[in-house]
A protein has these predicted regions:
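Beta-rich carbohydrate-recognition and catalytic domains
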Residues: 1-212, 216-280, 293-304
């Protein structure tokens, strides 16, 4: 029988020389070596900005992990150990993080506890080449655990679209409820009272995107002063966006685009070229808002 060994050889360099090499950007965070893509789980907690991101220990794309770095000022970063590794449910694709406590996530936190909850796309694994949503948590912002050993919380079969492109969850809190936007293919919106049990609110089979985000912004007047009006932004991977309202339609929470952003299909949510342009950089992708702790509460309704 033949035995194959895989050995990874790194250049012998001190940390300083990595970051002083030719063409290395100095302002934005960059991984020391290996493959990195989408930012994940961006959250501010206990005086630190936490940044997770897609990572593989190779120059080429491979089985995704969640690597990790922290900062106190968004300029100076400290690399931390990799936190989430592939498991029986699959490799670790993109996701997000929120702050919760016993009242808002009683299955995860005991009375008096709070911490971070992560939502991760598990890709592949024992279930085949499909995508599903799993969770993890931290009660101190320093040690991390997969929830229920990585158990699947939401599956691609749970909504009427039955589309296996089911990834990139982004969670936010609004009206005393948790909401999740999921895409990768078509957009879906789910809701939950406890971050564990999720229900379908609305689906948009004609609108395809990756790395969705949905957040409110206060409208400003012609003098650049804030008004009482709030609009919601559906961010399509940091490249394009739609502006509209997030509200109940026939008892289901839905994103309803303003007329200038709407398409001609029934729910106004198609892929026609009527989106706003968020940036023109061809390599700028998978943008995500930083979760600042009390986003979605009466104390801090608007995104920062």
């Amino acid at each position: 029988a033949k035995v194959l060994y895989r050995i990874r050889v790194h250049r012998m360099q001190v940390d300083e020389s990595y970051y002083n090499e030719d063409y290395r950007g100095q302002y934005h965070y960059s991984v020391k070596d290996g493959w990195a893509n989408d930012p994940n789980g961006m959250i501010y907690y206990k005086g630190k900005y936490h940044l997770f991101y897609q990572y593989y220990d190779s120059p080429n794309w491979g089985p995704m992990h969640w690597a990790y770095a922290t900062s106190t000022d968004l300029i100076h970063w400290e690399e931390q150990p990799i936190q989430f590794y592939p498991d029986e449910y699959g490799t670790m694709y993109s996701g997000c993080a929120v702050i919760a406590n016993h009242e808002t996530a009683p299955a995860i936190f005991n009375e008096g506890e709070e911490g971070l909850v992560f939502f991760i796309t598990s890709n592949g694994g024992n279930g085949g080449d499909v995508q599903k949503i799993t969770a993890a948590y931290s009660k101190d912002g320093e040690t991390f655990h997969k929830y229920d050993e990585g158990k699947v919380l939401i599956n691609w079969t749970d909504d009427s679209l039955k589309n296996t492109a089911f990834r990139d969850p982004k969670v936010f809190r609004y009206e005393n409820k948790w909401f999740m936007v999921i895409a990768g293919g078509p957009l879906r919106i789910y809701s939950s009272d406890d971050l564990v049990n999720w229900q379908v609110e609305s689906v948009y089979g004609d609108l395809h995107t990756e790395c969705p985000d949905l957040y409110p912004l206060v409208v400003k007047d012609e003098n650049n002063q804030e008004t009482d009006e709030v609009k919601w932004v559906l961010d399509r991977g940091g490249r394009k966006y739609k502006i509209g309202d997030f509200k109940q339609v026939n008892g289901k929470w839905s994103f309803v685009p303003d007329e200038q952003y709407a398409s001609t299909n029934a729910n106004g949510m198609g892929n026609e070229d009527n989106d706003g342009i968020m940036n023109f950089g061809p390599d700028s992708y998978a943008a995500m808002t930083y979760y600042m702790g009390d986003f979605g509460t009466a104390e801090n309704f608007k995104a920062q």
